[in-house]
Curated annotation (Swiss-Prot):
SMART domains: HhH1 (SM00278), TOPRIM (SM00493). May play a role in DNA repair. It seems to be involved in an RecBC-independent recombinational process of DNA repair. It may act with RecF and RecO. This is Recombination protein RecR. It comes from Mycobacterium tuberculosis (strain ATCC 25177 / H37Ra). GO terms for biological process: DNA recombination; DNA repair. Signal peptide: none annotated.
């Protein structure tokens, strides 16, 4: 254990995803060795993120405006909505250059052991979005692109039950080919592009 602010910094860094105690310690001592101006830039960026970044009112993507750039782009096909778990998954799909629709971010996946149920996800917003015809366009297809792991598959199954009886709506799931237990964000562009192109109809 170190004293005072140094240990506080290590503790806070250790709360970040994928950062263990040793990594937190290395990052902390790196920060102690850089120029004060570098620290000032980092804290300035963090303050801008805290104060200026919000979630898109339509899809839940990160944005610095009420609507993200994708929901604001009239060239995107508003009738097709790809459902993902997190904003980072949008970037994974965008890298494929295979999808020209819009997105809906759930904010996670069903995980009862961690206390995450349907009410903790943006499922109500999805149903409202389909029913209210955003931008006067009917949503005719939703593509479920949750992660190919236990939580993602459970979420996909739940979504199918909620969506399958909506008239005029086709529910599809990205095709197999992604490694089971993996995360969408780590899939290469070719594999994910093929999974999108080969999506299967569920309802």
């Amino acid at each position: 254990m170190f004293e005072g602010p140094v240990q506080d910094l290590i503790d806070e860094l250790g709360k970040l995803p994928g950062i263990g105690p040793k990594s937190a310690q290395r990052i902390a001592f790196h920060l102690l060795s850089v120029e004060p101006s570098d620290i000032d830039r980092l804290t300035g960026v963090l303050a801008k993120v805290r104060d200026g970044v919000r979630f898109c009112a339509v899809c839940g993507n990160v944005s610095d405006n009420e609507r993200c750039r994708i929901c604001s782009d009239i060239r995107r096909d508003a009738s097709v909505v790809c459902i993902v778990e997190e904003p980072k998954d949008i970037q994974a799909v965008e890298r494929t250059r295979e999808f020209r629709g819009r997105y809906h971010v759930l904010g996670g996946a069903l995980d009862p052991l961690s206390g995450i149920g349907p009410d903790q996800l943006r499922i109500r917003e999805l149903l409202s979005r389909i029913g209210e015809r955003v931008d006067d366009v009917d949503v005719t297809e939703v593509i479920i692109a949750t992660d190919p792991n236990t939580e993602g598959e459970a979420t996909a199954t739940y979504l199918v039950r909620m969506l399958r009886d909506i008239p005029g709506l086709t529910v599809t799931r990205i095709a197999s080919g992604l490694p089971m237990g993996g995360d969408l964000e780590f899939a290469d562009e070719l594999t994910l592009g093929r999974a999108l192109a080969g999506r299967r109809v569920l309802a």
